[in-house]
Amino acid sequence: MKSNVVIDIEMCIVQKEYQWKEYPYEHEIIQIGAVMMDEGYEITDEFSSYVRPKYGRIDHFIQELTGISDKQIMEAPTLEGALDRMMSWIGSGEATFYSWSKTDFVQISREIRAKEIDEEKMAVLLDKENWVDYQQTAGKRFGKPWRMSLEDALMFAEMELEGKQHDGLVDARNTARLIAKMEKNPESHFLQDRLQEEKEKNAEPLGTSLGSLLNGIRL
């Protein structure tokens, strides 16, 4: 059976002096959150793991943003360990991965290769064809060509953000909720449709307006 998995990662910053040749990137993963959905887009299971970075450090800004501390990540598994756990959780077989933007796929792919993690056991995760950028999907549905925030997309879908943003599992849950509503209502534009209906309802036809003005006037 094919798995539908929503993934969200949180990252810390790698200072320039630590961006060695074997890791020439600005960010490093410190948390992976994932939600599994069935074929009807109902949430069936959840996964979350902190990740111990090899090069990056959590500064004050990242700690305030994510709520993740140095202590939490120092006791966490490496990226390879966290990914092994996640892949075991997903199970064998085909999978479709949903994320909010392409960042998650790009960062995961970069780190797997830079840290020389066995690519064969991560093959399903490294295949770009298995990933859906739902930020792009939502942008097209709502006619917004710019990079929509998840919070804005939820608003357009007439939904509220649940929990604190910038927690990998919380963001994955909210993305999954949005996906479920949009996929179950493929023709709906939600807030935009309702506003258009109200606009049309409140707009009096020109003919009716003229008729009202001329009513009772003898010509």
Task: Walk through the language-model features, giving the residues of each.
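Conserved non-catalytic scaffold segment of RNase H-like nuclease domains
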Residues: 2-110
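Substrate-recognition/cap helix-loop segment adjacent to the acidic, metal-dependent catalytic center
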Residues: 103-129
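Short, glycine/acidic-enriched loop or turn micro-motifs at the edges of active sites
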Residues: 11-13, 136, 174
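Active-site-proximal helix-loop-helix substrate-binding element of RNase H-like nuclease domains
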Residues: 63-66, 73, 136-170
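Conserved protein kinase catalytic core
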Residues: 14-16, 139, 177
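Acidic two-metal-ion nuclease catalytic site recognized across multiple nuclease folds
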Residues: 177-219
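Active-site flanking residues adjacent to catalytic metal/cofactor-binding acidic residues
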Residues: 7, 132, 170
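Alpha-helical transmembrane segments that form the membrane-embedded catalytic/substrate-binding core
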Residues: 168-178
